[in-house]
Amino acid sequence: MTDLKASSLRALKLMDLTTLNDDDTNEKVIALCHQAKTPVGNTAAVCIYPRFIPIARKTLNEQGTPDIRIATVTNFPHGNDDIDIALAETRAAIAYGADEVDVVFPYRALIAGNEQVGFELVKACKEACAAANVLLKVIIETGELKEEALIRKASEISIKAGADFIKTSTGKVPVNATPESARIMMEVIRDMGVEKTVGFKPAGGVRSAEDAQQFLAIADELFGADWADSRHYRFGASSLLASLLKALGHGDGKSASSY
């Protein structure tokens, strides 16, 4: 197996196969769930809006893949600093049956100098998730934070507040996951000594098998080749799947999606 094939198989099994579009429908979510079951293995999860969780659960069970996890998003994509709303949305997502919640950190508040609201928001959502055995991923929106110091600070705050994963991006802003921001965030995980309990998720802009290989190489460099399993690493993507399958000898590499 070539290096690209090996990394592509790894990446496929780490994917949160995603559709977060305004025109999402039950039919599109059903199709996404079907795509998550591939000839070479299943993706780690699907990531969808909360209202589609019941139809996704039904579809995943019916196709014999109940182990594919269901992730959803809250405080999304705006990352406002209203803790009550973020918490209410997170509780609603849990009530819908989410296995994982990806909440957007109040990044604009941090840019304006407010570190406390981000900590409190993540902490509140973590308490709700922990009570229901739901994983919490925190989206810090690196492409808007821009500066290394802010990316580092948002990562640190999220981890201190209880994040199970730190995630680069919503996929809804001009700049999403980059190798540079990925390295900064994983270095924070390393520097804080939390690599056993905190994972990393690049999202948006990871579109090709070669992209995925590059992102995995950073994780392998920092933590060794065994770290990036589905408890410690995910890719938030949709168009990536077709490229990975093509690298693995399945399909033509074409995808209808841009995430």
Swiss-Prot record:
Main location (coarse class): cytoplasm
GO annotation terms (biological process): 2-deoxyribose 1-phosphate catabolic process; carbohydrate catabolic process; deoxyribonucleotide catabolic process
Alphabetic keyword roster: Cytoplasm, Lyase, Schiff base
EC number: 4.1.2.4
Pfam families hit by this protein: DeoC
Catalytic activity: 2-deoxy-D-ribose 5-phosphate = D-glyceraldehyde 3-phosphate + acetaldehyde
Pathway it works in: Carbohydrate degradation; 2-deoxy-D-ribose 1-phosphate degradation; D-glyceraldehyde 3-phosphate and acetaldehyde from 2-deoxy-alpha-D-ribose 1-phosphate: step 2/2
Function, as annotated: Catalyzes a reversible aldol reaction between acetaldehyde and D-glyceraldehyde 3-phosphate to generate 2-deoxy-D-ribose 5-phosphate.
Name of the featured protein: Deoxyribose-phosphate aldolase
Highest classification ranks of the organism: Bacteria, Pseudomonadati, Pseudomonadota, Gammaproteobacteria, Enterobacterales
Gene that produces this protein: deoC
